[in-house]
Amino acid sequence: ETIGAISYCHLKEKELQEIDMGLVITTVAGPGPIGFKKSFEEHHPINKIIRRILQKSNSDFIEYPFDINGSDERQYSAKGFRINTASITKSKYYEYSEYHTSDDNLQFISAENLNETLNLYTEVINKIDDRIIFESVSPYCETMLSKHNLYPTVGGAQKPDIDVKSKLDKVLWVLFKSDGKLSTEDVSDETNIDHSEILKISRFLEKKGLLKEI
């Protein structure tokens, strides 16, 4: 702990500077509740991914803010790396009376609890691997949509009903949000447009040469 993370950061300094997010696995097999400790950037995708999975699992969980007392996180998230690292725990450190006492032993943990947490971590890793991210090929100002037959020829200046997102609005949102960082699920969350529709529009714009998948 701590010195191991520091040693690894020293040995893999160049490689770690290319990493955006990670997981610190700790206190994962106790009898207590599932905990989710966020990374140092509140709105980073790693936090959104974990939160979605925990909500979908219908497990009661406790959400903890980033805490400077997380010694490994301090190293990976240091100024030279700034890797957003989060944790899923079961009986989080400092949150149970047995912590760092003689009762914090093999009788306190169980394979069943460990397996529950392992399954959640596996889901998170799979979701990270499956993220679909697009980037606009014209990031400097707005693309001329009429050139690509994407702009309506009649009534283009008319504003649609306030509660209805027109197809054009959705195209504009996808183009605006596709910055090479947000996944299609992130765009869906931020625009309140169904993910399947965001993905369909993104693929359509990719074929039009306006977006590229990264």
Report residues per predicted region.
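A structural supersecondary motif
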Residues: N84-S91
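Ligand-binding cleft/hinge of the Venus flytrap
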Residues: I49-N58
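Short, glycine-/Ser/Thr-/acidic-enriched flexible segments
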Residues: A29-G30, S91-E95
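Short helix-to-turn junction characteristic of helix-turn-helix DNA-binding domains
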Residues: K177-S178
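Alpha-helical metal-binding/catalytic segments enriched in His/Glu/Asp
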Residues: E1-I3, I88, L120-Y121, V187
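His/Asp/Glu-rich mid-to-C-terminal helical/loop segments that flank catalytic regions of hydrolases
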Residues: S97-C141, L182-E185, D189-I214
